[in-house]
């Protein structure tokens, strides 16, 4: 309670001081030409770093509207996680080697610190990666893939439809990596709570029920694929061929 009261007083004090602080900082100080040049270089570096990072994640690129590696799913192995962290560490080292914070504007100094903080957080996240529960009552890897395909994989051409099918095929490799990770964690005693099992099994079973798996209503992924292919600007024979391939 004492700590709560002290924190509350501190927040009130900051709120009271906010108008004065805003008044003092209302007029931004123009960055020097040198700082502007360094800012531009740093912005270009951040853009290159971002592009290099998302190149490791076909699914993230798809979510951003980029169709590179449109027929692939993410690599979710421990080795892939290590590669991602190694890339971020290398980018941080490159930034520190190529840029002098004292030559940057206030805005870019903040961006510098945020980039550094992001790598630090990635480092911690990777350190405790094995303690993460992959299965929860409200979702798991088996249900996230159908949701991803339905919500993010757009089909505006026959190659897009073929990429959709390729991703369904890729699911076997993807789930194999998930299974390998789960087994390794279980061997170390890291297992989701028992109450998660029943809803997870039920939700996962829903992924492989319905047509074309049985005589029920269309499976959500199958229904989504038919709808998207049906909307293609192509002749019916081409559409039918795409549907046969799934």
Predicted region positions:
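N-terminal maturation segment of proteins
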Residues: 23-245
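Gram-negative bacterial Sec-dependent N-terminal signal peptides
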Residues: 2-22
């Amino acid at each position: 309670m004492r700590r709560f009261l002290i924190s509350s007083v501190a927040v009130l004090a900051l709120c009271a001081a906010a108008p004065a602080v805003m008044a003092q900082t209302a007029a931004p100080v123009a960055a020097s030409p040198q700082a502007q040049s360094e800012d531009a270089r740093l912005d270009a570096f951040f853009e290159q770093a971002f592009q290099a990072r998302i190149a490791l994640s076909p699914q993230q690129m798809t979510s951003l509207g980029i169709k590179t590696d449109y027929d692939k799913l993410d690599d979710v192995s421990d080795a892939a996680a290590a590669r991602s962290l190694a890339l971020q560490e290398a980018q941080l080292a490159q930034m520190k080697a190529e840029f002098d914070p004292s030559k940057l504007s206030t805005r870019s100094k903040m961006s510098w610190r945020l980039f550094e903080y992001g790598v630090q957080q990635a480092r911690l996240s990777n350190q405790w990666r094995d303690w993460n529960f992959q299965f929860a009552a409200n979702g798991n890897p088996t249900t996230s893939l159908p949701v991803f395909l339905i919500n993010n994989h757009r089909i505006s051409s026959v190659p897009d439809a073929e990429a959709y099918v390729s991703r369904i095929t890729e699911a076997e490799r993807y789930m194999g990596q998930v299974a390998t990770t789960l087994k390794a964690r279980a061997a170390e005693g890291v297992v989701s709570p028992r109450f998660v099992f029943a809803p997870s099994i039920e939700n996962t079973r829903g992924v492989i029920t319905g047509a074309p798996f049985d005589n029920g209503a269309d499976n959500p992924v199958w229904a989504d694929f038919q709808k998207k292919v049906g909307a293609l600007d192509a002749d019916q024979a081409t559409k039918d061929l795409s549907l046969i391939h799934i």
